[in-house]
Curated annotation (Swiss-Prot):
Locations listed in the record: Secreted
Entries under InterPro entries matching the protein: AB_hydrolase_fold, Peptidase_S10, Ser_caboxypep_his_AS, Ser_caboxypep_ser_AS
Function in brief: Involved in degradation or processing of the mating pheromones. Its loss causes a persistent response to the pheromones. It may be required for stabilization of enzymes that are essential for zygote formation. May degrade the mating pheromone P-factor.
GO molecular function terms listed in the Swiss-Prot or TrEMBL record: carboxypeptidase activity; serine-type carboxypeptidase activity
Name of the molecule in the record: Carboxypeptidase sxa2
PANTHER family: SERINE CARBOXYPEPTIDASE CPVL-RELATED, SERINE PROTEASE FAMILY S10 SERINE CARBOXYPEPTIDASE
SUPFAM superfamilies reported in the protein's UniProt record: alpha/beta-Hydrolases
Glycan-modified residues: N38, N45, N259, N260, N300, N448
Superkingdom field: Eukaryota
Organism, scientific name: Schizosaccharomyces pombe (strain 972 / ATCC 24843) (Fission yeast)
Length: 507
């Protein structure tokens, strides 16, 4: 089942590729202690006291336009972040008795959780093949209680009179306050095992929000861990450039591209890696790795990709691509090589071809309808957040995105993830078909990260790899590569994603 929010996903991909440039270099080792929630008597008078009543009937979704059949139990409405802004939420309880409570955090930044609810892991789905809402048999509510948020403020249906939330600090504060508001509505969930799962830029939200929750004395919750799907984890060179040749080689082995030209491409990449000193970095991608920071070269990469694309495709041969894209921009080079065999290549899933229409988006049209907004209790969405194309426009708030990425964002691997792993589980999932966030770059970044007293993983992926991928799981941190998915894993292979969650994160 391929359930995508099409235009909105395309928008997410474009902006998340750009944000990678904003991440700084990191080559340091960390050993810190997590700041725990204060549960002493001195702060007990601040503790959130759950109200003993059932879920609010006013937030119950009683119907959805065009949905046929029995609607599952759903709630939506607003959670107060502070006096002048509220975040829109959708909550779906598990259909089985479950002690698991997952908060899903969409990427972008500036893309609404409502999109994920309808297109990735919620109980109701809308897709290109199914433009009317229908039951999603692979919903995460099959095993967990689920919450989706339109955050940060300025995203989706969220409403208020405040300025956009544009910093990690403010977004973290808003999230903590919104979660307090949520627990007041649904007090029985406070004792459930809480996990934050973020996709793409949502990896930054999930890790930072986890630390904010653990530093909040008024929340007495059962926090358990963080899941990161297609996560943005490193600076641009590490995430996209240095390991591009390994990514291309892996795609070729999977049989998607370059079946007859892989040896030629491999030789060309070998030359370029040496010229750019990437080979010295790749030599450190060992298991275990030596226990000192991995040095990497730095370059200024040209942004004139459209010009380079035209030049590279003129003549349509591999040699012309390598000649046209000189220097060390191996990410763009890889992208254009794929275009030679698939002129409709979509970077969030390189297995898609010209038969897929990324511009046919029934979900955004549906969410902008007045009757749908009324059914979802989203009638308070501020007109200030509404473009000429509706609240969701292309699915994401690009004005908000630009404001967020103008701030310097530190990789979550520098400090936060190592601290979290001291007491909690962190699990990464990456897709081999994702050209937006290269799994090879994430693995390189992890091998340059020290957590729980050791740098990187010790066990080699090669010793564990199957036709489906591999999983490394050491010292409270796991990394899974799936060969079946691209950037939006929950919609592409929901069964695999569930297995990843249950085997590496949920316990």
């Amino acid at each position: 089942m391929l359930s995508l929010f099409l235009k909105s996903l395309f928008a997410i991909i474009i902006i998340e590729l750009t944000i990678i440039h904003a991440l700084p270099t990191y080559t340091v080792h960390w050993k810190c202690s997590i700041q725990q929630a204060n549960t002493s008597s001195a702060s007990s008078n601040q503790t959130v006291q759950p109200r003993q009543h059932a879920a609010p009937s006013s937030d119950r979704i009683k119907s959805l336009p065009e949905f046929k059949g029995s609607l599952p139990e759903l709630y939506s409405g607003y959670l107060e972040a502070n006096s002048d802004k509220s975040l829109f939420y959708t909550y779906a309880p598990a259909v089985v008795d479950s002690e698991t409570f997952i908060v899903w955090l969409q990427g972008g930044p500036g893309c609404a959780g409502t999109l994920g609810f309808f297109s990735e892991n919620g109980p109701i789905e809308i897709s290109q093949s199914s433009p009317s809402p229908s039951l999603n048999p692979e919903s995460w509510t099959n095993f967990a209680n689920m919450l989706w948020l339109d955050q940060p403020f300025g995203t989706g249906y969220s409403q208020g009179q405040a300025a956009y939330t544009t910093t990690i600090e403010e977004a973290s504060s808003d999230f903590v306050n919104a979660l307090k508001s949520f627990y007041q509505k649904f007090p029985h969930l406070m004792k459930k095992k809480l996990y934050l799962v973020g996709e793409s830029y949502g990896s930054i939200w999930s890790a930072n929000f986890a630390e904010a929750l653990l530093s909040e004395p008024s929340l007495n919750i059962n926090f358990m861990g963080v899941g990161i799907v297609s996560g943005l984890t490193a600076d641009y060179e590490t995430q996209e450039q240095i390991t591009a040749s390994i990514w291309v080689e892996h795609i070729s082995k999977l049989g998607y591209y370059f079946n007859n030209t892989s040896s030629t491409i491999s030789e060309e990449f070998k030359k370029r890696n040496k010229e750019c000193q990437y080979d010295s970095v790749l030599n450190r991608l060992t298991f275990p790795t030596e226990q000192y920071p991995i040095w990497r070269p730095e370059y200024n990469f040209s942004t004139s990709t459209s010009l380079r694309k035209r030049e590279a495709l003129d003549g349509e041969d591999i040699g012309n691509v390598f000649n046209s894209i000189s220097g060390c921009d191996l990410y763009s080079l890889s992208n254009f090589l794929l275009y030679l065999e698939n002129s409709c290549v979509i970077t969030y899933d390189v297995s898609l071809d010209c038969s897929f229409n990324e511009y046919n988006d029934p979900l955004i049209t549906y969410l902008n309808r007045e009757d749908v907004r009324s059914s979802l209790h989203a009638t308070k969405a501020s007109t200030a957040l509404t473009s000429g194309e509706g609240v969701f426009a292309d699915g994401c708030n690009f004005d908000l995105y630009k404001k967020i990425v103008s701030n310097n964002v530190e990789s979550v691997l520098v400090e936060i993830i190592p601290r979290l792993t001291e007491k909690y589980k962190v699990s990464f999932l990456a897709g081999a078909l994702d050209l937006q966030i290269l799994w090879t770059g994430t693995l390189l970044a992890l091998q340059n990260t020290t957590w729980n007293g050791w740098q990187g993983f010790t066990q080699s992926p090669g010793s564990l790899e199957t036709t489906n991928g591999f999983t490394l799981d050491e010292r409270n941190l796991a990394f899974t590569l799936s060969n079946s998915v691209g950037h939006m894993a929950p919609s592409k292979d929901p069964q695999m994603v569930r297995e990843w969650l249950e085997n590496t994160l949920l316990y």
